[in-house]
Amino acid sequence: NPWVLLWSRCAWAYKQGSEGIEQGPYHLFSMLLCAFSLEAFLNHLIRINFPGNWEDFERKSSPEEKLDKLSEILGFNTDKGKRPFQTFKHVFDFRNDIVHAKTVKLEETSTFPIDKFLQADELPPLPLTKWETTLTTKNATRFFEDSQKMIAFLYKESGFGDDPFEEVYSRTTFEGNL
C-alpha cells in the first residue's frame, strides 16, 4: 500500500525534525508527506470500499472531494470546523503552495534599527512567502498529529478496525537514509 510507505517516511521525517538541530528540511518533508499520505489513504479507501473503475474520479477530484464522497457514501461526518479535520484544508493548501510554487517579488516594511543593520552580523529578517511562514515546528506537529488522527478515524469509519497503524500490513517500517 503506497500510503503505508508514505506514512512511514512522514513519521521518520517528523521524528528527525523533532529531535534534530536542522528542523526545517525535515519539517518540510514531513508536512508534504502528510498531504501525500492522506491522499494516498483516501485513494486506498475508495478502491477498497467501492469496486469498479475509480481512476477518473481519483485523477479529477481534489482530496476534499474524495473525503466528501467517502463520508457521503459511508455515512459519517467530518467536522471541518474542529481538529483534526479542520487541519485537512491547511495540509493541502500547504502542499499546493509548494507544488505550484512560483517566483514572487516580496516586499516588506522593516522596523529593523539602522544601527543594527549596519553591523555585519545583524540583518533584518527576510520577507517570507505564505508556505515559508507555515513551515514551523508547531505546524509540523499539528499536521502530523492531525493527519494520524484523520487516517485512524477514516479507517475505523470504513469498518476496518480501530487502528490502521497496528494492522499487520501497516507495520511496515523503513530504516536507513532516503
Predicted segments with their positions:
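Short acidic alpha-helical/loop segments enriched in Asp/Glu that coordinate divalent cations
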Residues: N43-S61, E108-T111
